[in-house]
Amino acid sequence: MCFASSIIEAHRKLFIAPPDLDHSDPATPTISTRSKMPRGKSRLQTEVCGDCGAGDPSWASINRGILLCADCCSVHRSLGRHISIVKSLRQGNWEPSVLNFVNSLNAHGANSVWEHHLLDGSTNSTGGKHVPRWRKPTPKDALHPTKSDFIKAKHVNLTFVLKPSLQDDDDGNGSAGCLEQELSRQLHASVRTSNLETSLRFLVQGADPNYYHEDKLSTPLHMAAKFGQASQIEMLLIYGADVNALDGNGMTPLELARANNHNTIAERLLDAMYDVTDRIITFLGGKKPDHASGRHMIIPDANGADISEQLKIARGKLQLVPNKMFEELVMDLYDEVDRRECEAIWSTSTLNADHATVPFLPANPFLSATRNQGRQKLARFNRAEFTGLLTDVLVDAMRRQNMANLRPMDAPVAGHQSLQSLPYANNSMLLGSFEQGGHDPNLSDDEPIYDPVASDDDYAPVPPMAQQAIVHTPPRSANSHNEMETLRKQLNDYKSEINQLKNVVQMLSSENTQLKSKFSSASNNSVYDEPLRIDLSLSSPDTEHEPLSLPEGGTANGESGSSNDSSNQSTIKRPASMYERRLVPNVAKGNTDIRNTTSMYQMAGDGKPFGEEVKVRSDLVTRRLKELIRAMQPVPEDQKQSIAPHGELIRSAVTDLIALYANLPPNASDPSRETLKLLTRQNILIQHECENLQKAIEADDKQAIQKNTLEVRDCAFHIASAIKTLVLQFY
């Protein structure tokens, strides 16, 4: 903890002396004017509030570089961290380099940058003739509205800041981009010196803290690290400089500081990389990790804590958040941590009723309304819930950082980025304030964006946790390189394998499509679809050869038998096996008018009667079916036969049988045509099912064996039934 009296006294001799004229900015006459002030007056200005002149300031605005009294600080806090980053001089936890920077900037005239037009008397230069002249308030003036209006004009609207003019551009083309580039080049040169006021003026006017100088091949942060300017580094970090930026030699500012033996600056840059997690760990009651020894994270240990199902779901959702959204969440949590710390100090240090508290984060006009709502809802978490959320974020940040270390070729993930630049990322460019004129009129701090949330139970209270230090040891470069090469090689192999499999799938798909089209065309253009008329007789003197019941329009003698036929068809029962007799009433025995005429198409091609040839080929199919059934019977392992060849033999025999009907005349009967269609379809299916059964037997898949066996039996039954129908036409 640091105390204002000892702080100011310790730095008085260092920062009160008149600045060196060689480092003064010729464009800012206030510097030379202040350097000629008596020592007593200069000392007096450094010990007073920068906004109202009150003595014994107890707060400081880090990014403004001024000290503040409690009255003015209350207004600064209500503006938000995107305007002013305030911290208590007496009770705040300060980094020595940051405290040194604030006192140095305050002592060397930071207020002359924010009150430029107020000091030179041109307070009406930014408005019309009806704009009233501004007067700097005194300590005795009322906080509202005198002090608050002045502070908002000074720090929000930047009314008194010397704004850059496009006519001042050297190339005379009036380009805003060229003006910003010129300001950035001057900032790049200024950070090599100790003149903080000049650098602050360039930043306020719109210079880019991450500007990459094409000739010097470096950024301003590289230059400040190279020349050992610790205060300049703090200013650049506060205004958003990237601590991981690379120069033309591929070096970061940290590596450049070490190369120039600026070890203290190197340690500070290393701490800045982990400022977010350090701040959260400290807020949780932990000790700041020793980054120099490789310890970057201290996460509370939740051993023995009851984890609810809701908390598990919330943690799972947190891990699915994209890196960019995770960065924004960490930024908002960082701001909320700062608000709660300041609020705790504020509640114990002020007794004035006019000093309003800040119950939630003020609205930031540079953020969306949805995000502002989410930021303000963070204040609804109680201490236990907020602690649980911070702990989960720390764990997930470490997980994302480890993933980034395992995949260095990828872009930096949220954990990597948030540990480096998030504490300063929400300091918007002040040049945007010149163009927009301050806050969005639709957003007001008097009417905060605050609505009910869906649920407050995502993070249930977490019991007290012990602390466990996690040490990260940097991996060896050689091993990491070898591992990365191995992973790249494996990745390429997997990609080639996937491409090969895709080609195989595409080839099989095309072949399948071709086969389907061929089968469809063969079925549609088959000679069996031609109309033919076959005189069928359903009578059989032999009960062993009972015919199948086929639909017919009437009997041969012209008697109507539709009612009997329909009743007989409804009582047909499917046999349990292909050899079991059908239980069909013998309805055809009463028919005595049997046609015995043999037509010309009933002669086979070799001169044999057609019916005799059909019977011969049908017997062959029957033998093949019996062989298949025997092969499917359970036998010892050494006597098992392959099922697939039997399917091929059956297909060949059935094909020969169907070939006899190739020359049928177009007057064949419908039952014959349907029977041949059924026989053709089942002939194709039985070979396929036999192959599937063989594969199931080889894989010893009992469920598949049972299923495929039923399919094979079903196909064999239909083939036998169709053959029986064809044979009975001739008996």
Curated annotation (Swiss-Prot):
C4-type zinc finger segments: 49-72
Domain Arf-GAP: 32-168
Database matches in InterPro entries: Ankyrin_rpt, Ankyrin_rpt-contain_sf, ARFGAP/RecO, ArfGAP_dom, ArfGAP_dom_sf, GIT-like, GIT1_C, GIT_SHD
GO molecular function: GTPase activator activity; molecular adaptor activity; small GTPase binding; zinc ion binding
Keyword field contains Metal-binding: yes
Coiled coil: 477-518
Pfam families found in the cross-reference section: Ank_2, ArfGap, GIT1_C, GIT_SHD
UniProt keywords, alphabetically: ANK repeat, Cell junction, Cell projection, Coiled coil, Cytoplasm, Cytoskeleton, GTPase activation, Metal-binding, Repeat, Synapse, Zinc, Zinc-finger
UniProt note: phenotype after gene disruption: Homozygous knockout flies show a semi-lethal phenotype and exhibit defective wing morphology at 100% penetrance. Mutant embryos show striking guidance phenotypes in ventral oblique muscle 5 (VO5) and ventral oblique muscle 6 (VO6), characterized by bypass and mistargeting of the mutant muscles toward the ventral midline. Defects in targeting of the growing ventral tips of mutant muscles toward the ventral midline are already detectable at late stage 14/early stage 15 embryos.
Compartment(s) where it occurs, according to its Swiss-Prot or TrEMBL record: Cytoplasm; Synapse; Cell junction, Focal adhesion; Cell projection, Lamellipodium
Positions with biased composition (Low complexity): 557-570
Tissues in which the UniProt entry reports expression: Expressed in embryonic muscle syncytia (at protein level).
Record function comment: GTPase-activating protein for ADP ribosylation factor family members, including ARF1. Multidomain scaffold protein that interacts with numerous proteins and therefore participates in many cellular functions, including receptor internalization, focal adhesion remodeling, and signaling by both G protein-coupled receptors and tyrosine kinase receptors. Through Pak activation, may positively regulate microtubule nucleation during interphase. May play a role in the regulation of cytokinesis.
Quaternary data: May form homodimers (via coiled coil). Forms a complex with pix and Pak; the interaction with Pak may be indirect and mediated by pix/dPIX.
Annotated domain remarks: The coiled coil region may mediate dimerization.
Protein name per UniProt: ARF GTPase-activating protein Git
Organism classification: Eukaryota, Metazoa, Ecdysozoa, Arthropoda, Hexapoda
